[in-house]
A protein has these predicted regions:
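Surface cap/lid and interfacial helix-loop subdomains adjacent to catalytic sites
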Residues: 33-114, 142-251
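Short, solvent-exposed loop/edge-beta patches enriched in aromatic
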Residues: 23, 113-120
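A short linear-motif detector with a strong N-terminal bias
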Residues: 11, 134-138, 177-181
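Alpha/beta-hydrolase fold nucleophile elbow
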Residues: 117-129
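Gly/Ala-rich beta-loop-alpha elbow adjacent to hydrolase catalytic centers
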Residues: 126-141
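Generic alpha-helix detector with strongest preference for long hydrophobic helices that associate
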Residues: 13-14, 89-93, 120
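Serine/threonine-rich low-complexity intrinsically disordered regions
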Residues: 2-8, 33, 51, 119, ...
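Secretory targeting and sorting signals
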Residues: 1-32
Length: 251
């Protein structure tokens, strides 16, 4: 082997050794997993189910979470003595609407705080429907106040047929404190939640969120069940990011 060839082999071998050493010296860049997105869900009156499912309100919507993780929250979902959580009536043993809402509020807030504690970087969407929307509205107000330790920047809200909808909801139309038959008006909810994007969804003439005319009485029976159906409002909107205010739908 000529001297020139020996030098070429030595240079190639040396270069290869340097490249191997450099590769070994460069640390592997870790790619962090994307933040998880939890949907904390409180269902409507009469929709209670055994844990861990807790509610039947989101059976179709949860098929459209785009990788999100549903967190169903149990509560009575009742309006006793008129209706129990399993849509049976009358039931004199069922918790009243007011009692049910209070328990829904406590359980939903506890679920949000526990989820944040276990996964501090995760996004949380607070979701409520009908009676569940009232409790979810109040939970979002609590988080917006800064009293929970959950950063507002991680939170959003989806309220379907919210009775506290400003201006048009049944509780916006009845004075705060009005009470009868186990129902007490908390008054309207806020239009904005101090930086938390919260969107309300209402089908016109649904008397829960659109108590603006006599037609809302019959409209409640016709429109109120539609949100949770396959291909309807919830399935089309639950995974949408951001947005504020009220989204109206025609009957």
């Amino acid at each position: 082997m000529t001297l020139a060839r020996r030098w070429r082999k030595a240079i190639v071998a040396g270069a290869a050794a340097v490249m191997v050493a450099m590769t070994a010296a460069v640390p592997t860049i870790a790619h962090a997993d994307p933040a998880r997105h939890y949907y904390l869900e409180l269902g409507g009156t009469g929709s209670a189910a055994p844990a861990p499912g807790c509610t039947g309100s989101y059976a179709f919507a949860n098929q459209h979470l785009d990788g999100g993780i549903p967190v169903p929250v149990c509560y009575p979902a009742s309006a006793g003595p008129w209706l129990n959580g399993h849509n049976q009536f009358p039931d004199p043993t069922a918790p009243s609407f007011d009692t049910s809402v209070r328990e829904g509020y406590r359980n939903l807030l506890a679920a949000a705080e526990d989820t944040h504690r276990r996964d501090p970087g995760a996004r949380l969407t607070i979701v409520g429907y009908s009676q569940g929307a009232q409790a979810a509205d109040q939970v979002l107000q609590k988080i917006a106040s800064g009293e929970t330790g959950i950063p507002r920047s991680l939170v959003s809200g989806k309220l379907y047929s919210d009775p506290m909808q400003p201006g048009t909801g049944i509780w916006a139309k009845l004075p705060k404190g009005w009470s009868a038959f186990g129902f007490t008006s908390p008054g309207p909810g806020p239009e904005k939640f101090d930086g938390i994007p919260v969107r309300r969804f209402c089908i016109r003439t649904d008397g829960v969120c659109d108590a603006t005319a006599l037609s809302s009485i019959g409209g409640f029976l016709q429109q109120h069940p539609k949100y949770q159906r396959d291909g309807n409002v919830m399935t089309k909107t639950i995974a949408q990011d951001g947005g504020e205010g009220v989204v109206w739908y025609e009957p």
